[in-house]
Regions:
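Structural register within alpha-helical repeat arrays
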Residues: 3, 36, 71, 107-108
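Short coil/turn linking the two alpha-helices of tandem helical-hairpin repeats
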Residues: 4-12, 23, 37-48, 77-83
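Canonical positions in the second alpha-helix
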Residues: 21-22, 56-57, 97
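Short coil turns that delineate tetratricopeptide repeat
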Residues: 27, 62-63, 102
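Terminal, low-structured helical/coil segments at or just beyond the last alpha-helical repeat
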Residues: 84-136
Length: 136
């Protein structure tokens, strides 16, 4: 995994290969799935591999505290308008933070600032339902 993270900025292709290798060895590693998502979706989030990798990161480690913030920030930037599964993951993650992990609300604020318009509306709706305000 270390190779994938170190290559992510300079060589997405090398990072993709490193994360793919890691997943062959450990297919339930949420961190490897999370790394594969930006490596394969750098320029095209409609890329099925990127969105599948992001989903697998959630499915294999939804509550991994080390991934909650960066994964939420990445998900907020993705075009979720054509993928109800990603919308559901965004809603569930925000709701979980509001109800069970208030110490991570800062991550929601960060995600909100970089979110697409559609994802901002989703985040706003979750906070409105909880009768809370979105953190700065």
């Amino acid at each position: 995994l270390r190779d994938g993270w170190s290559e992510l900025q300079s060589s997405p292709e090398a990072a993709e290969a490193a994360f793919t290798r890691a997943l062959r060895l450990s297919p339930m590693d949420a961190g490897a799935w999370f790394g594969l998502a930006p490596a394969t979706g750098r320029f095209d989030w409609l890329n099925p591999t990127a969105s599948k990798a992001l989903k697998m990161s959630y499915y294999t480690g939804f509550n991994r505290s080390d991934l909650v913030a960066p994964r939420l920030i990445l998900l907020a930037q993705v075009d979720t308008t054509r993928d109800v599964e990603l919308v559901d993951l965004l809603r569930r993650q925000v709701r979980l933070i509001i109800t069970r992990a208030p110490e991570l609300k800062g991550a929601v604020g960060q995600a909100y600032r970089v979110a697409t318009d559609a994802n901002r509306r989703i985040i706003e709706a979750e906070f409105k339902d909880a009768k809370q305000s979105i953190p700065e």
